[in-house]
């Protein structure tokens, strides 16, 4: 088991990153945490407001592509955990270069800093989407990467950079590939918070095509526990770990479950035009992470009920995010479903 005195958490003001910081502060309070975050639209200082002014915590507003800044922060820590990324597939179809810059070049900057300062671990948070669409079976860590969107390709590129640093320079590398994650503090562009916040306002719940695309949904608390376990206990010799529940759920089930919890009519579901290159199914083999001692504690049903309650109880967090820019993006992304003329 590894122990750390000081960690740099890149992207710690985002959804999974802020929940990971919250986990560390509650379970490993002896670790000093520096959060580096660019505070793009999806990074929110309110996610970490409870830690401001507390001992052992520092927030730095900055970009992981800023080599001088990253080097100065890396000099004072034992390890880097990198959540920093552009992460939304839909936006990657509109602004692909931003994803390549952050997810590939930014990862390289962090790897170089970790190498230079002889860090004990560099942990890269990746995604199951690097495997591409899986029609049958489940993706294992050694499978070939076949990304099909600018987002998943940029994450795969970041992984390749990190693995190259491990092979060329001996960088002590760990990588997690998580499935679709949901829970509190998730920016309302991803499916679950879009459905919940739209349902609160009695707006249509958009589902691509016929809503049949299949995903594995893991609650953010479980995902963060798995990341923490990998960081502290996973052997470096075989560094990649899938994180998921093994339970497959399609969009129709998610939307109907949200409406049932909230007592809203199913007529709110609206099918919209499919996005280009939409992967129909992701599925992970999670044997390696379960062999390490992890298993999910929060079922999809329990997690969804808790998540609905959180958004209902925290309109002051999400309503300001649904601003003019948000709706501009929303209208560009969710287009009416049309049928071919006869």
Predicted regions and their residues:
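Hydrophobic alpha-helix immediately C-terminal to the catalytic Tyr-X-X-X-Lys motif of short-chain
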Residues: 157, 161, 165, 195, ...
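N-terminal Rossmann-like NAD(P)+-binding domain of SDR-like oxidoreductases, especially those catalyzing
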Residues: 1-181, 306, 314, 320-342
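Short beta-loop-alpha junction of Rossmann-like oxidoreductase domains
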Residues: 133-135, 184-186, 190, 288
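A glycine/serine/threonine-rich, flexible loop-to-helix segment
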Residues: 51, 137, 188-196, 273
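C-terminal substrate-binding subdomain of Rossmann-fold SDR/epimerase-dehydratase oxidoreductases
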Residues: 20, 62, 79, 193, ...
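Generic recognition of short, well-ordered alpha-helical segments
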Residues: 19, 46, 71-72, 91-94, ...
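Residues that form or flank phosphate/diphosphate-binding pockets in enzymes
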Residues: 16, 43, 68, 186, ...
């Amino acid at each position: 088991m590894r122990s750390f005195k000081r960690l740099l958490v890149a992207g710690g003001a985002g959804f999974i990153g802020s929940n990971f910081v919250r986990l560390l502060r509650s379970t490993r309070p002896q670790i000093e945490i520096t959060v580096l975050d660019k505070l793009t639209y999806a990074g929110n200082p309110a996610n970490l407001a409870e830690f401001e002014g507390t001992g052992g915590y520092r927030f730095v507003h900055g970009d992981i592509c800023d080599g001088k800044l990253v080097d100065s922060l890396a000099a004072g820590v034992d390890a880097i955990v990198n959540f920093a990324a552009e992460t939304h597939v839909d936006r990657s179809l509109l602004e692909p270069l931003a994803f390549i810059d952050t997810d590939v070049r930014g990862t390289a900057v962090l790897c170089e800093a970790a190498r230079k300062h002889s860090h004990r671990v560099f942990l890269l948070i990746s995604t199951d989407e690097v495997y591409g669409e899986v029609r049958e079976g489940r993706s294992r860590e050694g499978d070939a990467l076949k990304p099909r969107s600018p987002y998943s390709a940029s994450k795969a590129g970041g992984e390749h950079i990190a693995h190259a640093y491990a092979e060329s320079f001996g960088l002590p590398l760990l990588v997690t590939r998580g499935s679709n994650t949901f829970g509190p503090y998730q920016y309302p562009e991803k499916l679950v918070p879009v459905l919940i916040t739209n349902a609160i306002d009695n707006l249509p719940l958009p589902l691509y095509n016929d809503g049949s695309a299949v995903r594995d949904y893991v609650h953010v608390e479980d995902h963060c526990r798995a990341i923490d376990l990998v960081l502290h206990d996973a052997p470096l010799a075989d560094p990649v770990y899938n994180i998921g529940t093994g339970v497959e759920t399609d969009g129709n089930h998610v939307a109907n479950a949200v409406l049932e919890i909230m007592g809203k009519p199913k007529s709110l579901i609206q099918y919209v035009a499919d996005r280009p290159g939409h992967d129909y199914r992701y599925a992970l083999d999670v044997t390696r992470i379960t062999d390490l001692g992890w298993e999910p504690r929060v079922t999809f049903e329990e997690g969804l009920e808790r998540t609905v309650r959180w958004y209902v109880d925290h309109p002051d967090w999400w309503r300001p995010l649904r601003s003019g820019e948000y709706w501009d993006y929303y209208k560009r992304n969710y287009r009416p479903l049309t049928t071919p003329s006869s």
